[in-house]
Amino acid sequence: MALTLEELVKRFGGEIAGDAQCKVGGLAPLDQAGPQQLAFLANPKYLSQVESTRAGAVLIAPKDLEKLGAAAAGRNFIVTPNPYAYFARVAQMFIDLATPPRAAGVHPSATIDPAATVAATAVIGPHVTIEAGAVIEDGVQLDANVFVGRGTTIGAGSHFYPNASVYHGCKIGPRAIVHAGAVIGSDGFGFAPDFVGDGDARTGSWVKIPQVGGVTIGPDVEIGANTTIDRGAMADTVIEECVKIDNQVQIGHNCRIGAYTVIAGSAGIAGSTTIGRHCMIGGAAGIAGHVTLGDYVIITAKSGVSKSLPKAGIYTSAFPAVDHGEWNKSAALVRNLDKLRERIKALEAALAAQGGTHA
């Protein structure tokens, strides 16, 4: 379905520069878009691509349109302060228009306990299991093989993709998106040591600590494929409003993730850690347990966080990739730092004995 720029602006705002009746039926990158497609410029370093694009129209910020000057002549634009966010909303609209809603109802192969409550507007797919006391609210879509444990509530408009699981006693807020294979509410990693003796004479075992808390997830949260969020030991693990979590992220028991925080793939957050609002956690970052990150903290990819970081800012501990030979030289220097330090101390002592000075 194609829409005019005028129709888009009525829905999403912005101002038109060019032909308001230009029709677009999809989106594409600047260097690939055709006359029936809408492109966007989010990074001014690609401004030259706007001059050469074949796109029917371009989403652009006011300052970037000014930079184009005469090159903007004969082209069509929707001018908006945030072209990237505008693009995201238009993309979702086109997806919604192209995807007919699934009919409400329960697939014959689904297993629903008689003591569960399922809204008439919910879509329950093949082989879904819903245990006693669970509540599935209006407009929820549960795809094939989803498991919902006893006493769990799935908020209105949420969508669970195939093979996602949410254990018992969890609360999922409205409009959650939970991707395939994600697990919410599995046991936290809690074991009490019960050992006697030392060395080879040591006897005993680890005693499992029952995890009697749950998981509470706020509105508009998205959870990536194969991500795991452990239930609390006593109180709930909490994911606040509008948190976005990528694939294969591990969140330990009793964590609290503040609203609007984003966490990239393969990050690991150990138990009882609190992350503030509007934080950004890079891919494969590791955060130790029982620490607190303040609001607006950014942790770069592969960084390790071992202590609390209460102040907003960018933190990194990762070593960026370099040429292999250069890395080997650096590693050799690191291995010899203790020896070099001792040599420097010896030289300083010798200078001092001779009456010399050193910085």
Swiss-Prot record:
Which EC number(s) are documented for this chain?
A: 2.3.1.191
> A single GO CC term, please?
membrane
Which residues are the active-site ones? H253 (proton acceptor)
Biological pathway: Bacterial outer membrane biogenesis; LPS lipid A biosynthesis
Q: Which reactions are catalysed by this chain?
A: a UDP-3-O-[(3R)-3-hydroxyacyl]-alpha-D-glucosamine + a (3R)-hydroxyacyl-[ACP] = a UDP-2-N,3-O-bis[(3R)-3-hydroxyacyl]-alpha-D-glucosamine + holo-[ACP] + H(+)
Any Gene Ontology biological process: lipid A biosynthetic process
**InterPro entries to which the protein is assigned, alphabetical:** Hexapep, Hexapep_transf_CS, LpxD, Trimer_LpxA-like_sf, UDP_GlcNAc_AcTrfase_non-rep
Write out the entry's keywords from A to Z: Acyltransferase, Lipid A biosynthesis, Lipid biosynthesis, Lipid metabolism, Repeat, Transferase
Pfam families, sorted = Hexapep, Hexapep_2, LpxD
Judging by the UniProt lineage, the source's domain of life is Bacteria
Respond yes or no to whether keyword Lipid metabolism is given for this record: yes
What is a GO molecular function of this protein?
Answer: N-acyltransferase activity
- KW Lipid metabolism (keyword) present: yes
Family (UniProt) = Belongs to the transferase hexapeptide repeat family. LpxD subfamily.
Its annotated function is as follows: Catalyzes the N-acylation of UDP-3-O-acylglucosamine using 3-hydroxyacyl-ACP as the acyl donor. Is involved in the biosynthesis of lipid A, a phosphorylated glycolipid that anchors the lipopolysaccharide to the outer membrane of the cell.
Question: What is the protein's quaternary organization?
Answer: Homotrimer.
* Name of the protein in question: UDP-3-O-acylglucosamine N-acyltransferase
Q: Which organism is it from?
A: Burkholderia cenocepacia (strain ATCC BAA-245 / DSM 16553 / LMG 16656 / NCTC 13227 / J2315 / CF5610) (Burkholderia cepacia (strain J2315))
Its gene is lpxD
